[in-house]
């Protein structure tokens, strides 16, 4: 990958790259599909299309009308496309593009019904689009940044070209915090002052060691899982890094001021550290209860809980049988979306429509900004994006992680029953399963009666002559 | 007939049983794999595939074998994979 200049970044430290823009990516995403692997990960195409198509004219910050600096002469073809976009009805264009069709959108547990393009003048249809876009652009968008304090001992003052998994995970956890403090129906206010909770959340994701969930602190916490400045990372390691960071913060805060920095239990649904069975992960209700109990410092009451489920859903590419199951997780009210994307390119997938994932892209380069914890007048525009990007679900890399937020015991029970229903639909290959308690591993040796197992009559008992071997010798690596 | 119970992996990380495993473990859950034996450092992900899907952890080896043994050679093929990275 070549390192491109930070195209699309203005000198402003709070460049509203996507503010108020919508879905010129309808064509950019198609382009990206074809050449994304050859392109820099800084998504230059998407920057090219970040000219201000104002859908929410009335809602605009004036800053959104600045011309982007990315429309350089070398991308003249894009102006042609832009003219096409501008000349027609935006809704019609969207309706015939693949970014948003007339099909229902499932977005973080909420369904948006979008009517067909014929009814572009229909107020219901428009409100379907508009309410979806308002929801989409209220999500916290966290991207590559440059110009922050160097990460620990490294010389890195930017995470361009390596930080996308960290950024994607920050987006998912930020949504969990938004849901927790402000609820699923919260929308970014059009006017300042903002909610103190909202500003407080953004502050935690600032790019410095002083911010609880900064890239600096995540890399440090994830050190033993291979996280390091400049290195790529997978979703499993990322989830473990969060687990470590949350635990560390909790211990520190208990010592310092007794406050919780992370207001919920965190459950990384995976096996043990060293020995794992490696099959579909198992959500264990007793483990979740114990984590809630620990969070409440021993009181046996339930607490809010964040579940992260890291998965690998195929060897070279995603096994297509998992795609309907992945889609269905977005219908759960507890849905926090997915960390993942095309191979090498992690995004925050927050919704689905038809066979396409709708995501927030961290591969834009913005200047680091410092949002003080109490500055309710802060400019937060660089933390929101109205550009809906999409990719075909069957192109996503098999390595990903799914997130869920359960507010209380009832919500957790609802999650468990939905997850169990999904197991039943999985035809023997679920994404993950739910059990009440951890079963001690069954390691029964069949010294006598292998034929007792139903359906295994073909197994030859006569070969059972190695009962003296230890389990370790039974499983050799070729 | 011994060979049919071998387990074999691909995708860089291969696993095999020294015969008899499915008989001996047919009432067992999926075997617990030690990462060091797969040359995976601690802290890395481990996922096991049978027929390109993640087997359910509670499934018994006997039923996994019966469902997914290779019809041609009688092997049960297991594949081990860690995770990809992103940047």
UniProtKB/Swiss-Prot annotation, chain A:
Catalytic activity: [protein]-C-terminal L-amino acid-glycyl-phosphatidylethanolamide + H2O = [protein]-C-terminal L-amino acid-glycine + a 1,2-diacyl-sn-glycero-3-phosphoethanolamine
Entry's EC annotation: 3.4.22.-
Record SUPFAM superfamilies: Cysteine proteinases
GO CC annotation: cytoplasm
Pfam hit, one: Peptidase_C54
Keywords: Autophagy, Cytoplasm, Hydrolase, Protease, Protein transport, Thiol protease, Transport, Ubl conjugation pathway
InterPro entries cross-referenced by the UniProt entry: Papain-like_cys_pep_sf (IPR038765), Peptidase_C54 (IPR005078), Peptidase_C54_cat (IPR046792)
Chain segments carrying region Disordered: 1-31
Domain of life: Eukaryota
An annotated Gene Ontology molecular function: cysteine-type endopeptidase activity
Active site: 164 (nucleophile), 361, 363
One of the GO BP terms on file: mitophagy
Composition bias, Polar residues: 1-15
Entry keyword Protein transport: yes
Compartment(s): Cytoplasm
Subunit structure: Interacts with ATG8.
Family, similarity comment: Belongs to the peptidase C54 family.
Function: Cysteine protease that plays a key role in autophagy by mediating both proteolytic activation and delipidation of ATG8 family proteins. The protease activity is required for proteolytic activation of ATG8 family proteins: cleaves the C-terminal amino acid of ATG8 proteins to reveal a C-terminal glycine. Exposure of the glycine at the C-terminus is essential for ATG8 proteins conjugation to phosphatidylethanolamine (PE) and insertion to membranes, which is necessary for autophagy. In addition to the protease activity, also mediates delipidation of PE-conjugated ATG8 proteins.
Name of this protein: Cysteine protease ATG4B
Protein's organism: Oryza sativa subsp. japonica (Rice)
From Swiss-Prot, chain B:
Compositionally biased intervals (Basic and acidic residues): 1-14
Segments for region (Disordered): 1-30
Membrane association type: Lipid-anchor
GO CC annotation: autophagosome membrane; cytoplasmic vesicle; microtubule
Lipidation feature positions (Phosphatidylethanolamine amidated glycine): 87
Highest taxon listed in the record's lineage: Eukaryota
Record PTM: The C-terminal Gly is amidated with phosphatidylethanolamine by an activating system similar to that for ubiquitin.
Keyword Membrane: yes
Coiled-coil segments on the chain, per record: none
Single Gene Ontology BP annotation: protein transport
Cellular location(s): Cytoplasmic vesicle, Autophagosome membrane; Vacuole membrane; Cytoplasm, Cytoskeleton
Predominant location category: membrane
Keyword match Membrane: yes
One Pfam family this sequence matches: ATG8
Molecular function terms, GO-annotated: phosphatidylethanolamine binding
InterPro entries: Atg8-like, Ubiquitin-like_domsf
Keywords tagged on the record: Autophagy, Cytoplasm, Cytoplasmic vesicle, Cytoskeleton, Lipoprotein, Membrane, Microtubule, Protein transport, Transport, Ubl conjugation pathway, Vacuole
Family: Belongs to the ATG8 family.
Assembly and oligomerization: Interacts with ATG4.
Described purpose of this protein according to its UniProt entry: Ubiquitin-like modifier involved in autophagosomes formation. May mediate the delivery of the autophagosomes to the vacuole via the microtubule cytoskeleton.
The protein, known as: Putative autophagy-related protein 8E
Organism annotation: Oryza sativa subsp. japonica (Rice)
